[in-house]
A protein has these predicted regions:
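Cysteine-dependent hydrolase recognition
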Residues: 1-190
C-alpha cells in the first residue's frame, strides 16, 4: 500500500465553519456537478469509503472485521440504537447539528432509538487539568459494550481524543471489547 488517494478539500478551505473534506467528490457521476456545502446527499450516486490501513497486515485485519460485520452473528436490538455525542460550548452549535441530523432521520424512519449524550446535558467535574464529564465517559462505554449501530460525534477533537475533556480517547477505543457489535462511527470534528 504505497499510493494514497487524496481527500477532496472544499475550494474555500480556510473558512472555519464551512470548510470540509469529503470523498463524496469521487462519487459524483454527473458531469458538471460540484460538491457544495449545502448540497443534498441525494445527489450522490455511489457509496464510497476507505479502509484506513497503511500495511497489508492492517488491511487484512480491517477486511476480516468487515467480513465479521457482514456475517452479523450478533443480531439484536442494538442495531436499532443510535448514540449521539455532542460537544459543549460554541453556543450549542454541536448539539444543534446533532438535533438537525436526528430530525432528518425521523422524517425518513421512526424505527431508531436515539441515545443523546450531549455534554451540555451532564454535570462537569472540575479537576486540576480542567473539566471532565465522567458520566458521559461511562455512558459512552456502556453504549459501546451493549452495542450501538451508530456512534455519531459532533464537536472538537483530534486523532487522540474527542472533546477537550476527552470523553472518547484513543486508549479507551483500543480497550473496547465489542466484537460482533461494532458501531459505524462518524466524527464531525476538527
Amino acid at each position: 500500500i504505497k499510493k494514497e488517494l487524496p481527500v477532496y478539500t472544499s475550494e474555500v478551505s480556510n473558512a472555519i465553519l464551512t470548510s470540509y473534506s469529503s470523498d463524496d467528490f469521487y462519487a459524483i457521476q454527473q458531469p458538471g456537478n460540484q460538491i457544495q456545502f449545502t448540497q443534498s446527499i441525494d445527489s450522490i450516486h455511489l457509496a464510497i469509503g476507505r479502509i484506513p490501513a497503511r500495511t497489508i497486515a492492517e488491511a487484512n485485519k480491517m477486511v476480516e472485521k468487515l467480513i465479521q460485520y457482514q456475517s452479523n452473528k450478533k443480531m439484536g436490538l442494538w442495531q436499532n440504537q443510535l448514540t449521539w455525542v455532542a460537544d459543549d460550548a460554541d453556543f450549542n452549535l454541536h448539539l444543534q447539528d446533532a438535533e438537525e441530523i436526528i430530525s432528518n432521520l425521523k422524517t425518513k424512519t421512526a424505527n431508531w432509538n436515539h441515545k443523546k449524550l450531549y455534554l451540555d446535558l451532564f454535570k462537569a467535574s472540575q479537576t486540576l487539568t480542567g473539566n471532565t464529564y465522567p458520566d458521559v465517559n461511562k455512558a459512552i462505554q456502556e453504549s459501546i459494550q451493549a452495542g450501538t449501530l451508530l456512534l455519531n460525534y459532533t464537536g472538537h477533537g483530534n486523532y487522540l481524543r474527542l472533546t477537550e475533556e476527552a470523553v472518547i480517547s484513543k486508549s479507551e477505543m483500543q480497550s473496547w471489547n465489542n466484537t460482533g457489535k461494532l458501531p459505524i462511527m462518524v466524527t464531525a470534528s476538527c
